[in-house]
Amino acid sequence: MSGDPSEEELEELRKKKMEQLKEQQGGEGEGQEAAQQQAEAQKQAVLKQNLTDGARKRLNTVKMSKPQVGEQIEQQVVALARSGRVQGQIDEDQMKELLSELTPDSKSFDIKRR
């Protein structure tokens, strides 16, 4: 042995390095997941604080049928609450107004028979 590592030693070093990399990546993924869960919990707390029960039910119904629109509404309500533009709680009528503002007009068409 003249100081050159054998194939077995090289293989062991590679395995150790791969395990270290996997541990580092796993740790970062858990941190991101925890941050996302915390952000979601904060968002839900803000919504619960600023929406009445009726408005919350309406929002949940919209989220079930149109998830993207529901997310937009949630983001809008959170932004309004954080900027201080919400006075009291948003009731069901105000939620209807928000929904009508943020949802695109549905295209309707008439069929005419001759």
Swiss-Prot record:
Residues 12-22 have a biased composition (Basic and acidic residues). Keywords: DNA-binding. Residues 1-11 have a biased composition (Acidic residues). Pfam families: dsDNA_bind. Transmembrane segments: none annotated. This is DNA-binding protein rrnAC3180. It comes from Haloarcula marismortui (strain ATCC 43049 / DSM 3752 / JCM 8966 / VKM B-1809). Gene3D superfamilies: PDCD5-like. GO terms for molecular function: DNA binding. Residues 1-45 are annotated as: Disordered. Residues 32-45 have a biased composition (Low complexity). Belongs to the PDCD5 family. GO terms for cellular component: cytosol.
